[in-house]
Amino acid sequence: KLRVSNDPVMNGMVEGLGANPTVVSFGELYSALQTGVVDGAEQPIANYKSNAFPEVANNLILDGHTLGAVQAVITDNAWGKLTENQQAAIMEAGADTQAFNADLSETAENKVLDELKSSGCNVVDVPDKAPWQEACQKVISENTSDQAELYQQLLDMKA
């Protein structure tokens, strides 16, 4: 039983991997792991550590199944009021920030992983993700059919 929020895509992924998706609120996750209501959960590494989940679930699997993204948004009206130089400066700052944040995030994540390993947490890397991806192909297909071009662009960016 793997903890999920009430999300059909996540439920499909969990089912594809052969687990039983179980809806548990985040606030109840620690006790749900502690009492066996669920056997596991998916969490960002920093959340896993900061919420003391290693105390009740001491195995961390690094499968890379999600990618967090944060966007800066601006209305067409506001963007149109900017000069071309201002627009270019914003785009350049965004690119610089993206690179800086990627480096910062990787450094912070590696630090947390080192701390977890030092404290006795069993950290398992999944070097061959292809079987995991194949197991989730059904839910991927079901949820990208109307956006196949965008999905392919994302895959191409990753490669």
Residue ranges of model-derived segments:
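N-terminal secretory/targeting leader peptides
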Residues: 1-159
